[in-house]
């Protein structure tokens, strides 16, 4: 699972948040400048939700979520998403992840709205699933800790990455585990 407000507000790292406080401020400045440019131009610039800050505080963002072609020696997470969204397995011509990007300033809507703020108020049975090798695993583990329900389960799927759990191409989705959780908790 992804906590999208955390992902946009703190950057997605490999098992932890990526932005420092200075990085976060730089991203906010960048997005606010872009918002003014968009207003002045009467149109918006496309962009993804993952914004990069280098060691000197310079901010850069791509004009699309995934590249047209995969670069040599890609980051494993980029390859994972590319192999799903840009290939027949998950491609759709109207999918933002497959072919384009959102409005570049879209992260502003998420950055100051922590989605899990009220997770402790969730008292219904809750099943959270993540892959053992998912770069996003920390989102699921933290969400599980925050959920207020006594009837909750965190399923960490052995050997699975984030995208393995989109469909069952890799044969890793534990449907029997899900069925048992639902039989036990949905009455």
Q: Where would I find each of the regions flagged by the language model?
A:
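Alpha/beta-hydrolase-fold enzymes
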Residues: 1-82
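Flexible internal linker/loop segments at domain or repeat junctions
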Residues: 83-105
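Conserved alpha/beta-hydrolase "acid-adjacent" motif
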Residues: 110-114, 130-141
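Short beta-strand/loop motif that positions the catalytic acidic residue
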Residues: 122, 128-130
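Short, conserved loop/helix-junction motifs that constitute active-site signature segments
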Residues: 119-123, 146-150
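Active-site nucleophile elbow and catalytic-triad environment of alpha/beta-hydrolase enzymes
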Residues: 100-118, 124
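Catalytic active-site module of serine/aspartate enzymes centered on a nucleophile-bearing elbow/loop
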Residues: 158-187
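Conserved beta-strand scaffold positions in the cores of enzyme catalytic domains, especially
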Residues: 154-156
